[in-house]
């Protein structure tokens, strides 16, 4: 961004630490307590083959959620037209009761719930364009008619979910699996022919 001259057009904000109550918007207290209790004082604790906790993992995860919620505040309150959160760890693989795929808390799902709870936003849409399918976000949105999840991702690939047939309880899930080697043309087609019509039908507020 600095090299291309965009840095001066950005307003930088440090990630604030989310309260644990925010995490509870999408994860049950038992799960939160398990994560907190699993954070080691040194070394690492493995939650699965891919996902581990180090002494700083909880702080990083809470700041990732805090950044996303602050971004929601800025956009909903009209302080910014858009926002980008450069945060780790990622979140889209974390399910309601399960950390996986390097993800501890589902950052974007929590931010969607935060927008609804804090600001009264009714309908929230999330588009995921990672190479891996966001199974956790899909699981959390599956049965909520006011949440919409769209994803472009490579299949077959971890975590193995994300087929076109996975539509959600209210047709609020849109999956556009791509194959290895697909490029910009296929990606644009998925957006224009599948995801945008789905968004137009859903009519999100955010």
Residue spans of the language-model regions?
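HDAC/HDAC-like amidohydrolase catalytic core signature
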Residues: 1-206
């Amino acid at each position: 961004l600095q090299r291309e001259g965009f840095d001066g057009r950005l307003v930088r904000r440090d990630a604030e630490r989310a309260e644990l109550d925010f995490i509870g918007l999408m994860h049950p207290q038992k799960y939160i307590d398990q994560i907190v209790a699993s954070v080691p004082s040194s070394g690492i604790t493995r939650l699965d083959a891919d996902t581990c906790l180090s002494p700083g993992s909880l702080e990083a995860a809470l700041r990732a959620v805090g950044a996303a919620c602050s971004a929601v505040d800025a956009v909903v309150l009209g302080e910014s037209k858009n926002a980008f959160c450069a945060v780790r760890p990622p979140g889209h693989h974390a399910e309601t009761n399960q950390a996986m795929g390097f993800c501890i808390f589902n950052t974007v799902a929590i931010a969607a719930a935060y927008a609804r709870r804090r600001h009264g936003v009714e309908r929230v849409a999330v588009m995921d364009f990672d190479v891996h399918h966001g199974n956790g976000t899909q699981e959390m949105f599956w049965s909520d008619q006011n949440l919409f999840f769209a994803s472009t991702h490579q299949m077959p690939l971890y975590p193995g979910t994300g087929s076109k047939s996975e539509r959600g309880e209210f047709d609020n899930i849109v999956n556009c699996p791509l194959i290895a080697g697909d490029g910009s043309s296929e990606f644009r087609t998925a957006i224009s022919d599948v995801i945008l019509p789905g968004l137009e039908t859903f009519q999100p507020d955010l």
